[in-house]
């Protein structure tokens, strides 16, 4: 019985890791596609992970901004933190920063698209993207 429970737990854990790995692969592809398709301005960095427009595009493709409600955006960003950041301390920091940025940027009366861009810019400025698995792969 104990070995059955252990096997079941390990199988569930493996499925969770596989799902997160698949989501990371999709995010990587979206970032690469957005970096190729979006025009790069002269003053923008060469690294696509340092470009707000690329992050906004990739996160929009993954559905983070589908629902303009701040609570829905926070929930989706928190899922992103759990997938893209591996260190538990950095995951908590990512969740706090994204929550703060969503609160700050949704107070303004701007279009939903501009709010989404501003949220991505706020998170990028805070350094959260530097703690992601994607940044360590460079």
Swiss-Prot record:
Q: What UniProt keywords apply to this chain's record, in alphabetical order?
A: Allergen, Disulfide bond, Secreted, Signal
Q: Where is it made, tissue-wise?
A: Expressed by the venom gland.
Tell me where on the tree of life, at the top rank, the source sits: Eukaryota
> Keyword Cell membrane: yes or no?
no
Q: Span of the secretion signal?
A: 1-19
Against Gene3D superfamilies, the record matches this protein to: 1.10.238.190
Indicate where this protein resides in the cell: Secreted
Instruction: List the CDD domains.
Output: Sol_i_2
Q: Name one GO cellular component term.
A: extracellular region
Principal subcellular localisation of the protein: secreted
Assembly, in brief, is: Homodimer; disulfide-linked.
Q: Which family does it belong to?
A: Belongs to the ant venom allergen 2/4 family.
| Protein's name according to its UniProt entry | Venom allergen 2
């Amino acid at each position: 019985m104990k070995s059955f429970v252990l096997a079941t737990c390990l199988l569930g854990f493996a499925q969770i890791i596989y799902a997160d790995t698949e989501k990371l692969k999709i995010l990587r592809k979206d970032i690469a596609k957005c970096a190729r398709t979006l025009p790069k301005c002269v003053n923008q960095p060469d690294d696509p992970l340092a470009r707000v427009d690329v992050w906004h595009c990739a996160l929009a493709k993954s559905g983070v901004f589908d629902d303009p409600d701040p609570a829905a955006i926070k929930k989706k960003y928190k899922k992103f933190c759990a997938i893209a950041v591996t260190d538990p301390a950095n995951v908590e920091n990512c969740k706090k920063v994204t929550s703060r940025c969503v609160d700050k940027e949704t107070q303004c009366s701007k279009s939903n698209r501009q709010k989404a861009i501003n949220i991505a810019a706020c998170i990028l400025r805070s350094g959260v993207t530097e703690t992601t698995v994607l940044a360590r792969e460079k």
